[in-house]
Amino acid sequence: MMNTKKLLKMAKKWQQRAALRRKRISFHRSTDTTSSSTAAEKGCFVVYTSDRIRFAFPISYLSNSVIQELLKISEEEFGIPTEGPITLPFDSVFLEYLIRLVQRRMDGDTEKALITSISSTRCSLPCSFQLQEHSSTRLVF
C-alpha cells in the first residue's frame, strides 16, 4: 500500500500536468450546459470513465487501495495524461458500483478480492478519443 504523502504527491503531479495543458483542452458545450466546469472543486480530483462521464472524488479517496488500483490501471492503459484528463478504462456504471463498495468500508479480504477482480477483468480502449458535446459531473461524498 502506498503512503499518503506519496499519493498526494502523485495526485498533485497529475493535477499540475493537467493544469499546464488545461487551456488547450476544449470541451464542447451546448448553450444550456453552464453548471459543469473543467476545474475540480477544492479538495477534489476528477477522473473520466470510458463513456466520458466525469466523476469528482474527495482527495481522501486517494488513500483507498481500490482507488489506487484504478489509477494504476489508468496509468498502465493510457499513461500519465499530459494533454487531457485522467481517464479510467471502465464505464460509469462499473465505477458507480465500485464507489458504493468503497463507501461500505469493506474488510481486507473483500478489498483484495475486488482489486484482483478489477485487474483481471478490465477492458481496453483506443487511446485517442474525444469528449462528447455533453459532459456530466458526478460528485462522490
UniProtKB/Swiss-Prot annotation:
Localization, UniProt: Cell membrane
Topology versus the membrane: Peripheral membrane protein
GO cellular component, one term: plasma membrane
Keywords: Auxin signaling pathway, Cell membrane, Developmental protein, Growth regulation, Membrane
Matches recorded under Pfam families: Auxin_inducible
Biological processes, Gene Ontology terms: auxin-activated signaling pathway
Keyword rRNA-binding: no
Sequence similarity: Belongs to the ARG7 family.
Summary of the function given for this chain in its UniProt record: May promote auxin-stimulated organ elongation, such as hypocotyls, stamen filaments and petals.
Protein name, UniProt field: Auxin-responsive protein SAUR61
Organism per entry: Arabidopsis thaliana (Mouse-ear cress)
Origin organism lineage: Eukaryota, Viridiplantae, Streptophyta, Embryophyta, Tracheophyta
